[in-house]
């Protein structure tokens, strides 16, 4: 039978006794403590000699006028000119559209504006060889940043509705429901025609709280609310209301002039130009072909 020998029991007992002896000599095990073992020296006040120029600089930095950005009236925190222009970029292969208040786009724009439409259908990063400028919206007049940011907000809202609320569209919704997941994702990615139509609608005053309307040209606030509701309902039905005297003027610069025909109609307050300002000045590296 399996039995434990006397020598094994002796060794185990000897080990326990040795451990007990060490514990008795060293004392009880000290638990961890959050208090520092050494005293932390208190900070001493040092006398520094400063020059008169350094003292004047410190006084200027403490002044709130030095730290305040040059912002527009009533829009604190936004630098001057922010929102006067709105850029739209599109993916030349998949047709996705990204809006920006700057002439460049980053990966953050892609994360915030592009929803998940399917596996391997969302770009992982911004590649300059795939993204091209679609159009640039410029508002007429000075200090139109608040109006531009309102237009930017409406464009993003309409784009989000096209991508996530497509089932409410009777005809288009039925077409997408009968397609596979990948085909449906490809259709949802192609937002270029919808984005052009959204530009025409937003610049025509569509959307609640759209600042494209000039309040000063209307008789009363109730009249303004009525005109906004009228224009919003007409745009939803596919029409554009002629509100030339009630809308701010805007100019749309196109990379390709044919893209503007994706919209059914443009309001009279919008003018169109070919060529985005600043694109022609960019230096392009010449393509060198081998003689072989």
Swiss-Prot record:
GO terms for molecular function: DNA strand exchange activity; single-stranded DNA binding; structural constituent of ribosome. InterPro entries: Ribosomal_mL67 (IPR024629). It comes from the Eukaryota. Residues 59-83 are annotated as: Disordered. It is found in: Mitochondrion. One of its GO terms (biological process) is mitochondrial genome maintenance. One of its GO terms (cellular component) is ribosome. Keywords: Mitochondrion, Ribonucleoprotein, Ribosomal protein, Transcription, Transcription regulation. Belongs to the mitochondrion-specific ribosomal protein mL67 family. PANTHER family: LARGE RIBOSOMAL SUBUNIT PROTEIN ML67, MITOCHONDRIAL HOMOLOGOUS RECOMBINATION PROTEIN 1. Component of the mitochondrial ribosome (mitoribosome), a dedicated translation machinery responsible for the synthesis of mitochondrial genome-encoded proteins, including at least some of the essential transmembrane subunits of the mitochondrial respiratory chain. The mitoribosomes are attached to the mitochondrial inner membrane and translation products are cotranslationally integrated into the membrane. mL67/MHR1 also has extraribosomal functions, being involved in regulation of mitochondrial DNA recombination, maintenance and repair, and generation of homoplasmic cells. This is Large ribosomal subunit protein mL67. It comes from Neurospora crassa (strain ATCC 24698 / 74-OR23-1A / CBS 708.71 / DSM 1257 / FGSC 987).
């Amino acid at each position: 039978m399996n039995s434990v020998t006397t020598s094994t029991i002796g060794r185990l007992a000897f080990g326990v006794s040795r451990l007990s002896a060490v514990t008795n000599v060293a004392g009880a095990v000290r638990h961890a403590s959050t208090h520092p073992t050494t005293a932390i020296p208190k900070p001493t006040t040092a006398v520094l000699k400063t020059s008169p120029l350094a003292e004047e600089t410190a006084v200027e930095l403490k002044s709130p006028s030095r730290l305040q950005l040059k912002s527009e009236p009533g829009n604190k925190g936004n630098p001057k000119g922010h929102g006067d222009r709105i850029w739209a970029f599109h993916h030349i292969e998949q047709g996705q559209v990204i809006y920006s208040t700057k002439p460049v786009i980053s990966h953050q724009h892609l994360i915030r504006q592009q929803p998940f439409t399917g596996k391997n259908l969302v770009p992982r990063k911004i590649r300059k060889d795939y993204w091209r400028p679609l159009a640039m919206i410029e508002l007429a007049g000075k200090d139109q940043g608040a109006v531009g940011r309102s237009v930017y907000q409406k464009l993003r809202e309409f784009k989000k509705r096209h991508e996530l609320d497509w089932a409410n569209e009777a005809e288009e919704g039925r077409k997408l429901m009968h397609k596979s997941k990948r085909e449906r994702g490809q259709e949802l990615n192609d937002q270029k025609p919808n984005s052009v139509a959204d530009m025409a609608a937003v610049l025509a005053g569509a959307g609640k709280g759209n600042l494209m309307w000039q309040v000063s040209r209307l008789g009363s606030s109730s009249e303004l609310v009525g005109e906004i509701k009228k224009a919003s309902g007409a745009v939803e039905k596919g029409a554009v209301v002629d509100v030339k005297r009630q809308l701010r003027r805007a100019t749309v610069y196109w990379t390709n002039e044919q893209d503007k025909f994706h919209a059914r109609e443009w309001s009279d307050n919008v003018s169109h130009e070919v060529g985005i300002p600043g694109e022609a000045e960019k230096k392009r590296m010449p393509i060198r072909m081998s003689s072989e």
